[in-house]
Each structure stands twice: as structure tokens, then as C-alpha cells.
A protein has these predicted regions:
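Metal-dependent phosphoester/phosphodiester hydrolase catalytic core
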Residues: 15, 137-168, 172
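Metal-dependent phosphoesterases centered on the DNase I-like endonuclease/exonuclease/phosphatase
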Residues: 164-262, 266
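Single conserved hydrophobic/aromatic residue that forms the stacking wall/gate
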Residues: 301-302, 309-312
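Structured beta-strand-rich core segments of catalytic domains in phosphoester-bond hydrolases
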Residues: 62-149
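Active-site metal-binding loops of divalent metal-dependent hydrolases
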Residues: 4-7, 62, 149, 191-192
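Acidic, Ser/Thr/Pro-rich beta/coil linker or hinge segments at domain junctions
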Residues: 254-297
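Short, solvent-exposed beta-strand-terminating loops
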Residues: 1-17, 262-271
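Acidic/histidine-rich helix-loop elements
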Residues: 6-37, 153-162
Length: 313
């Protein structure tokens, strides 16, 4: 999973507040900068694969289908042959979540967008949760959820109810699948804007690190308990981007088996720069405020072995 940090094209989307990422805006978002951003995202994804690119890549902060078309067809990633699915959310800025997939190892069966009805909570619209169903080589179905939870704008305490509400929608969907499938292979990835010990993850989803005996129909967070992080705030690393799987995926029933040790946060040197204020390293961002910096993203990418799927024959 990778939060690509504001992947916008240079064209205005009707009814969306994307004005800060237009050529005549103070940030000066040009075609050259847009294509450089695409090339950098492609570089990160290719680097994660070593010999082969990942079979599945979840993304968030993608503006639209046009951006993904350019990423998969007009960037160095074009040789990988990815296909993709993306939500069409009511988010005011127009950003969405998406999943890249390899057709040779993941046969798309269907997709669904889970909307988050915020009118009753007097909250502005947020991103839909993407649910993608695919068949893998074993013949089993892999259910993948990609999410980007409401931000911490206004403070953690004030904004928490919105993340709890969104997590409840995700939990209902995941729980129904876990109880429906004979082989519940469920993977949840995304920017939760919460840490592993926060209530949206630890209580609503009940997802903690796998310790002791694993239960097939429970959720486990492979990012819980990590010393390293995906995001740095005021000199401290933390994990806001989570990778959660069903216990069935941890029990080794088929080729998709994973483990806590096989999940990694990748800190490639080219993704980092010196933190001049707090010391140490910090992710190299595309913008610092309104100043173009030409980096990669505010977050690091994480991977897990379930993205290594056998080829479907």
C-alpha cells in the first residue's frame, strides 16, 4: 500500500475543489511536475518488487481515472501491465483510493464502493472504501479493501468519531465476508489516519498483532507493534498506514499464506532526506507547504507476501 500524496492531473474536475493543483495556482502544478510525480511513483512500485513487481498495489490520494491511466500506460510502470480499479468518491477535493492488479495472478471478479453517509453527522463527504474481489491460482477468492479514513483535521479527539464511524462500515463489510466465505482470505490496506492502538483499529476492527493462537475469522494488524513507521511527525515515526489480514491468511491453507515477519515498511534511501528541524530522516515530499520540493510522498510504502500470488493457468 502506498499513499502517493496528492496525485492530481493538471485539469479541473467539475464540482471538485482541485484548484490548488492547477498550473495557474500558487503551487504551480504543471504537466512536467505531474509526469515527474508519475515517474517517481512508478520507481517506488518497481523497487518493491525486486525481480517482479507486486501483484497488488493499493493507492490513496489519487484524483481520478485519468491519473491511473497515465501511471499504468505513460510512465515507467507501463511495462508491468497493470490493470486497475478506482472509486468515484464524493470527497470535496476529488481524491480517491485505487487498486492496481496483475491479471495473470488476480482475476477480477467484481468491485464495490462502500459509501460513508456523513450528512447525519454534519461532516463533509469523505472517500469511499474500495472492495475488490478476485480469484487467485488456488481457485479461492481474495477480498481486498482499500481505504483512506477521515483526517485528523480539527484535532484527534474532535475528528475521531468520523474515523470510528467509517471503521464500523468497513468492519460490517469485512465481517460479513469472513462469515460467508469457506476460505475467508481478506486483506485490508490503507491510510487510517490512526495508529494501531487507536480505537478505530484496535476496538472497532479488533485488529491487533498476531500473537499466540491465530483464529481464522478474526482480523490481525501486521503493522501493530512496529518500531519503524510510515509517517514522521515532529521527529517521531508512527504507523498511520495499516495492513490488516484475516486469520485465515496467517494459517497457511494455500499459497497466499503470510505472516507478521513477512510484512515490511520499506525505507529506501531515495525516499528519505534529512530532517533539519528534529534530526534523523524524514520522507521526501512533493511539496513543503506551497513550495515545490520534488520529492515522493509524505508516507513510506509497505508490502506483505500475500501480494506474491501464483500465476493463474
Amino acid at each position: 500500500f502506498y499513499n502517493v500524496e496528492n496525485l492530481f492531473d493538471c485539469q479541473h474536475d467539475t464540482l471538485k475543489n482541485d484548484y490548488e493543483f492547477l498550473p495557474d495556482a500558487p503551487k504551480g502544478w504543471t504537466q512536467a511536475r505531474y509526469h515527474d510525480k508519475l515517474a517517481k511513483i512508478a520507481k517506488v512500485i518497481i523497487a518493491t518488487g525486486e525481480e517482479n513487481v507486486p501483484d497488488l498495489v493499493g493507492l490513496c490520494e489519487v484524483e481520478n481515472d485519468h491519473c491511473l491511466k497515465d501511471l499504468t500506460e505513460n510512465s515507467p510502470l507501463r511495462e508491468a501491465g497493470y490493470r486497475y480499479v478506482i472509486t468515484d468518491s464524493p470527497d470535496e477535493r476529488g481524491i480517491d483510493v485505487a487498486l492496481l492488479y496483475q491479471r495473470g495472478s488476480f482475476k477480477l471478479l467484481g468491485k464495490n464502493s462502500l459509501s460513508v453517509p456523513y450528512k447525519e453527522m454534519e461532516r463533509r463527504p469523505t472517500r469511499d472504501i474500495l472492495h475488490v474481489m478476485g480469484q487467485v491460482a488456488s481457485g479461492d477468492t481474495l477480498d481486498v479493501f482499500v481505504c483512506h479514513m477521515p483526517s485528523r483535521a480539527g484535532g484527534e479527539e474532535k475528528s475521531e468519531p468520523y474515523r470510528l464511524f467509517t471503521a464500523q462500515i468497513l468492519n460490517i463489510a469485512a465481517d460479513s465476508i469472513i462469515n460467508l466465505r469457506q476460505h475467508p482470505n481478506v486483506m485490508i490496506m490503507g491510510d487510517f489516519n490512526d495508529y494501531p492502538t487507536n480505537n478505530s483499529i484496535a476496538k472497532v476492527l479488533g485488529a491487533v498483532a498476531p500473537k499466540g493462537e491465530v483464529q481464522a475469522k478474526k482480523l490481525y494488524n501486521l503493522m501493530d507493534g512496529r518500531k519503524e513507521g510510515t509517517y514522521r511527525y515532529r521527529g517521531e515515526w508512527g504507523v498511520l498506514d495499516q495492513l490488516i489480514v484475516s486469520g485465515f491468511l496467517l494459517q497457511g491453507h494455500d499459497s497466499m499464506r503470510t505472516s507478521y515477519d513477512k510484512a515490511q515498511i520499506l525505507k529506501y534511501p531515495f525516499l528519505l532526506e534529512e530532517d533539519e528541524k528534529y534530526g534523523g530522516d524524514i520522507p521526501s515530499r512533493t511539496y513543503w507547504g506551497k513550495k515545490y520540493h520534488g520529492g515522493y510522498s509524505l508516507s513510506l510504502i509497505h508490502i506483505s507476501e500475500p501480494t506474491r500470488l501464483d500465476v493463474i493457468s
